[in-house]
Swiss-Prot record:
Protein name: Nucleoprotein
Coiled-coil spans in chain: none
Organism: Rabies virus (strain HEP-Flury) (RABV)
Functional description taken from the UniProt entry: Encapsidates the genome in a ratio of one protein N per nine ribonucleotides, protecting it from nucleases. If expressed without protein P it binds non-specifically RNA and therefore can bind it's own mRNA. Interaction with protein P abolishes any non-specific RNA binding, and prevents phosphorylation. The soluble N-P complex encapsidates specifically the genomic RNA, with protein N protecting the genome like a pearl necklace. The encapsidated genomic RNA is termed the nucleocapsid (NC) and serves as template for viral transcription and replication.
Subunit structure, interactors included: Homomultimerizes to form the nucleocapsid. Binds to viral genomic RNA. In nucleocapsid, binds protein P and thereby positions the polymerase on the template. Protein P acts as a chaperone on free protein N to prevent it from aggregation before encapsidating genomic RNA.
Record gene name: N
Superkingdom as given in the UniProt entry: Viruses
């Protein structure tokens, strides 16, 4: 008997077949650099910076920016942002800089140039006759890179969220050490005329390069990061959610994974912790792998690890976290089962803590406390034990263990308890649910059961 086949009759004829479904045909690409070469892009001929500044500023005032010219200018302007490397800087075996080296953003990457001239038109007229200052260059670079952040804000954000962000960014780039170079609302107007900057590979690459530089190098103009910070851990929402989750419940990654009682987690956990990646290395190329073009399909996105993502946010919903209630459910990754496990884990970690005295008036008090704790431990070890050791976790006061939670789930037949459902309904019904969000899912799924 073939376990994969089913047998049935069609017009009195016995049919035996193996049901096969569509599987994910896309290969996830890991970002590790194997050839020891820095990330690279190719741009047109390097411009005269004064001419380029006037052209790009003119285009911004007219809300008509040429993406190729913008990228060429941003790459050339990197020379204005020299800083000192605080420590030897290596990533994936590549030496980026030594401690004490003077570096600029283009020290992190390779930017090749062709002989193709840019347009450098004066779309918005010619207003500036003198050469721009470094502060003016810095302001223009900051405003241009902020188009990346604005284009990453999804349409789900209601009201004037994007306009308010744009206004705050403009205020930053008209305050010292920057200088005002555009009229109010110019940034938002420019964004509306071309809203897809985050999809332009070269622009995304330059935004990631600037962000990687300013995140490590102390600099007068570090506030430029306000527009590029969204390139850090881009398309890593699954991994970022897991990191936030373990901090929230105060466990190590290893301890947390022991609570993941579902076979569908196996492939996702293997994918998230693939050896050879620099997920835990500060200032690695890994942090900006998406913008630097090191991976076309991220293995760390919410879709790539959808069961993990769903579970984490169901636990977050149980704990009443707005971020989780607003997050989008990955519908193809067993949300009903994940909501059950999320209820039990939410109950396990919600409203409980592990506490102990850590600070004392003097050394004598510390020693007395440690001696008393040692005595308690000795007494516990000497207990003749009225409970079988296998059942210890479940029946003793120590319920915060994977074994105890798993036992509770099995004793309830893999179903949520009424108290779990009431909690889910309570947090989701008091929240204005966005379409396809966890709040909407919980409301629709459990409100009739409460």
């Amino acid at each position: 008997m073939d376990a994969d086949k089913i047998v049935f009759k069609v017009n009195n004829r016995v049919v035996s077949l193996k049901p096969e479904i569509i599987v994910d045909q896309y290969e996830y690409k890991y970002p590790a650099i194997k050839d020891l070469k820095k990330p690279c892009i190719t741009l047109g001929k390097a411009p005269d910076l004064n001419k380029a500044y006037k052209s790009v500023l003119s285009g911004m005032n007219a809300a008509k920016l040429d993406p190729d010219d913008v990228c060429s200018y941003l790459a050339a302007a990197m020379q204005f942002f020299e800083g000192t490397c605080p420590e030897d800087w290596t990533s994936y075996g590549i030496l980026i800089a030594r401690k004490g080296d003077k570096i600029t953003p283009d020290s992190l990457v390779e930017i090749k140039r062709t002989d193709v001239e840019g347009n450098w038109a004066l779309t918005g007229g010619m207003e500036l006759t003198r050469d721009p200052t470094v502060s003016e260059h810095a302001s223009l670079v900051g405003l241009l890179l902020s188009l990346y952040r604005l284009s990453k804000i999804s349409g789900q954000n209601t009201g004037n969220y994007k306009t308010n962000i744009a206004d705050r960014i403009e205020q930053i780039f008209e305050t010292a050490p920057f200088v005002k170079i555009v009229e109010h609302h110019t940034l938002m107007t420019t964004h509306k005329m071309c809203a897809n900057w985050s999809t332009i590979p070269n622009f995304r690459f330059l935004a990631g390069t600037y962000d990687m530089f300013f995140s490590r190098i102390e600099h007068l103009y570090s506030a430029i990061r306000v527009g590029t910070v969204v390139t850090a851990y881009e398309d890593c929402s699954g991994l970022v959610s897991f990191t936030g989750f373990i901090k929230q419940i105060n466990l190590t990654a290893r301890e947390a994974i022991l609570y993941f009682f579902h076979k569908n987690f196996e492939e996702e956990i293997r994918r998230m912790f693939e050896p050879g990646q620099e997920t835990a290395v500060p200032h690695s190329y890994f942090i900006h792998f998406r913008s630097l073009g090191l991976s076309g399909k991220s293995p760390y996105s919410s879709n790539a690890v959808g069961h993990v993502f769903n579970l984490i946010h169901f636990v977050g919903c149980y704990m009443g976290q707005v971020r989780s209630l607003n997050a989008t459910v990955i519908a193809a990754c067993a949300p009903h089962e994940m909501s059950v496990l999320g209820g039990y884990l939410g109950e396990e970690f919600f409203g409980k803590g592990t506490f102990e005295r850590r600070f004392f008036r003097d050394e004598k008090e510390l020693q007395e406390y440690e001696a008393a704790e040692l005595t308690k431990t000795d007494v516990a070890l000497a207990d003749d034990g009225t409970v079988n050791s296998d059942d210890e976790d479940y029946f003793s006061g120590e319920t915060r263990s994977p074994e105890a939670v798993y036992t509770r789930i099995m004793m309830n037949g893999g179903r949520l308890k009424r108290s779990h459902i009431r909690r889910y309904v309570s947090v989701s019904s008091n929240h204005q649910a966005r379409p396809n969000s966890f709040a909407e899912f919980l409301n629709k799924t459990y409100s009739s059961d409460s």
